[in-house]
A protein has these predicted regions:
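Outer-membrane beta-barrel channel domains
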Residues: 1-48, 57-68, 74-336
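Acidic, proline/serine/threonine- and glycine-rich low-complexity intrinsically disordered segments
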Residues: 340-341
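Conserved small/polar residues in nucleotide/adenosyl-binding loops
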Residues: 344-350
Length: 352
């Protein structure tokens, strides 16, 4: 949470309990998570501020040693590494992962996809899920930072590369070891900063990739929203490809019932001596004049060179999409019922 210099901090809370056997749900205040607004309707309370002392520090180090015995290939390996979590002060935090071992991560859900579009899988590795919210800039089927790219299958063995297909088809590993990952964040009351980097180890057929990201976010006012800037850089030496992405994002609230948000981005991709520039933007506006009515409008544009998949995720580019959504709800005292929903979404290619 941002620093609060006063002795009292204001927060909003809710308490809920669900009894599955009776299909009953209790909450105070009476809110249902699937109905908007939810978070903004929490009950406000005042608590003693825990962060009055700005010199509070903590340092945690979790080392590990693991061994692997491959009976099929008759080889053995021992891995040594660890993770460091350093709360420098109430605003700053440094996280470091050295030669991480993610063997405890649960597997992904099985999703059957017969389309030509990539399926997005959220990252479940602890280091890449904790304290990562500052770097999140997203859109419709789009994320500028997708940490699943880090430690993924080596470039030389990917489906898009044919130089080692004969050798790689017998390659038993679908991941790349990570040498180090570092994340630094500083979250003040007005300004927030973040730096992120991860360096991969070399594999049998490929050199490791290098990932870098920088983030700045500024609170315009307690009610007026935020503006921010994100930059990412990826070096993929095995396929002679470099990616440089710039993103400017905004979230503005003209009033308590309206919101205007989105981003503008430029992608610079250099591959084998050729450079391509791509552009994209997203603008969305929502309005809730009353509890019964909600409207949402958006436009997305991604040109044919707006490929951010080196470090991010985009389901499809070379298109423009326009959408409108209306929700009308009737809210009696004891229950709520949805009267009508009207949704229109049109997607067109940018090149005919």
């Amino acid at each position: 949470m941002p620093e609060e210099l006063k002795n009292i901090r204001k927060i909003n809370i809710t308490v809920a309990r669900k009894i599955h056997k009776d299909a009953e749900y209790y909450a105070s205040p009476g809110l249902w998570p699937m109905r908007s607004p939810f978070l903004t309707s929490f009950k406000p309370i005042e608590i003693k501020n825990f962060s009055v002392k700005t010199n509070q520090k903590s340092f945690d180090f979790f080392p590990y040693v693991s061994g692997t015995n491959n009976f099929i290939e008759n080889n053995r390996s021992i891995n040594i590494g660890g993770e460091i979590f350093w709360d420098i002060d109430s605003q700053s935090k440094l996280d470091v992962s050295l030669n991480p071992d993610f063997g405890q991560v649960e597997s992904d859900d099985v999703i059957v996809n017969f389309s030509a579009n990539e399926t997005f899988y959220p990252d479940k590795r602890p280091f890449f899920t904790e304290n990562q919210s500052l770097f999140e800039v997203i859109g419709q089927d789009l994320r500028f930072i997708n940490t699943r790219r880090i430690g993924a299958i080596p470039d030389k063995c990917s489906d898009t590369n044919e130089s080692h297909q004969g050798q790689c088809k017998d390659y038993r590993y679908d991941s790349t070891d990570i040498n180090v990952a570092v994340r630094y964040t500083k979250k003040g009351k007005i300004n927030q900063y973040g730096l992120f980097t991860s360096l991969e180890d070399n594999s049998l057929f490929s050199r490791g990739r290098d990932f870098f990201a920088g983030r700045f976010k500024k609170n315009l006012d307690s009610t007026k929203g935020t503006i921010g800037y994100l930059v990412t850089y990826v070096d993929r030496p095995s396929i002679q490809r470099k990616s440089f992405i710039n993103v400017a994002d905004f979230d503005y609230r003209p009033s308590d019932t309206s919101r205007l948000f989105g981003w503008v981005s430029q992608a610079n991709i250099e591959e084998k001596g050729q450079t391509n520039n791509g552009y994209g933007f997203r603008i969305a506006y929502s309005e809730r004049p009353s509890k019964e009515f909600f409207s949402y409008y958006f436009i997305n544009y991604h040109d044919k060179n707006f490929n951010i998949n080196d470090m991010g995720y985009i389901k499809k580019y070379d298109n423009i999409s326009i959408g409108v959504n209306f929700d009308i709800e009737k809210t009696p005292e004891e229950k709520s019922s949805l009267i009508s929903v009207s949704y229109t979404h049109l997607t067109l290619p940018t090149t005919m």
